[in-house]
């Protein structure tokens, strides 16, 4: 039987996630030579090279390394779960957690969650990473973020998730638009207007698919980089829009009213999820955040 240690496995995972030994050593608060020695010992025990080493280019996983990475993450996750089950943490936790979040949802959902979590764990530090669907997913898969809050359409089926909320699509209209006088607005009516979309692939495809599924081809007049710019353009009469994220106030940043109306057609809501890699190690702090978020 191969006699490796959990420390060697942990150092291997850290190096794979950071792409170089120096950064991995800093993250684990150990000396670089100790990190290099542990990885070398693991390669010797396994009889396989786990990394390609090229001067000035960092480290990349070999085929054997890529296979081992999934297994190593699963092994460390199991060890953490066993440890947590044997000695459940009591009282407030300390430590650091990196939380990714889809940028449109971040101001809508995170402040409330973080405020409540801070009351339970005042000494815990939660670092935030905000980005579009792709950036948040990559931060999760690459190990930068241990958890991520995003719409379900932004993640693959093999990523573990917990549903936090379900938000139905709705229409954004200029407050003075004739359609704003209706209690609900059909996709057919919206398809005749100038449509403003956020310039993100998953978002574009999702909202366009709602029209296509009902036999409509909308006219996209403009793309924006942010949700608030989209809302601002709608408020000032540049077009109409669809969204699932619904701020409490129906006004643009510069104070102009926006009319928000439900869609007449029955459309499935978008799920807001808290996501984590299936094979990722879940720290006690991450487990506490998951438990707290699921209760809210």
Predicted regions and their residues:
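Hydrophobic two-helix hairpin corresponding to the core of helix-turn-helix DNA-binding domains
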Residues: 12, 24-25, 62-65, 117
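Short helix-boundary/capping micro-motifs
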Residues: 13-31
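A short LG(V/I)-centered, amphipathic sequence patch enriched
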Residues: 43-63
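Alpha-helical linker/hinge and terminal dimerization helices associated
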Residues: 45-46, 68-90, 152
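Interdomain hinge and pocket-entrance segments immediately C-terminal to HTH DNA-binding domains
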Residues: 57, 63, 87-106, 120-124, ...
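Central regulatory/effector-binding core of bacterial HTH transcription factors
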Residues: 94-156, 217, 224
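Beta-alpha-beta core module
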Residues: 157-168, 182, 189, 228-278
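Secondary-structure junction motif
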Residues: 193-214, 245, 249, 282-291
């Amino acid at each position: 039987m191969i006699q490796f240690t959990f420390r060697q496995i942990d150092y291997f995972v850290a190096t794979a996630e950071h792409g170089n030994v120096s950064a991995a050593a800093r993250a684990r608060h150990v000396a670089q030579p100790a990190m290099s020695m542990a990885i070398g010992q693991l390669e010797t025990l396994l009889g396989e090279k786990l990394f390609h080493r090229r001067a000035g280019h960092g480290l990349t996983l070999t085929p054997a390394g890529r296979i081992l990475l999934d297994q190593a993450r699963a092994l460390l996750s199991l060890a953490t779960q066993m440890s947590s089950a044997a000695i459940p943490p009591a009282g407030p936790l300390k430590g650091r957690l990196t939380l990714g979040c889809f940028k449109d949802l971040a101001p809508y959902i995170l402040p409330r969650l973080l405020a409540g979590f801070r009351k339970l764990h005042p000494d815990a530090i939660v670092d935030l990473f905000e980005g579009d669907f792709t950036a948040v997913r990559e931060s999760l898969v690459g190990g930068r973020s241990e958890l991520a809050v995003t719409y379900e359409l932004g993640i693959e089926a093999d990523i573990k998730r917990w549903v936090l909320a379900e938000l139905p699509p709705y229409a954004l209209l200029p407050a003075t638009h004739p359609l704003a006088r209706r209690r609900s607005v059909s996709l057919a009516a919206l398809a005749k207007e100038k449509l403003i979309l956020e310039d993100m692939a998953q978002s574009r495809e999702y909202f366009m698919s709602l029209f296509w599924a009902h036999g409509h081809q909308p006219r996209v007049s403009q793309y924006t980089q942010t949700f608030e710019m989209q809302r601002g353009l709608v408020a000032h009469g540049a077009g109409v829009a669809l969204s699932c994220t619904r701020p409490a106030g129906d006004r643009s940043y510069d104070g102009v009213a926006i009319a928000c109306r439900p869609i007449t057609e029955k459309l499935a809501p978008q799920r807001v999820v808290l996501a984590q890699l299936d094979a990722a190690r879940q720290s006690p702090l991450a487990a506490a955040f998951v438990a707290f978020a699921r209760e809210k």
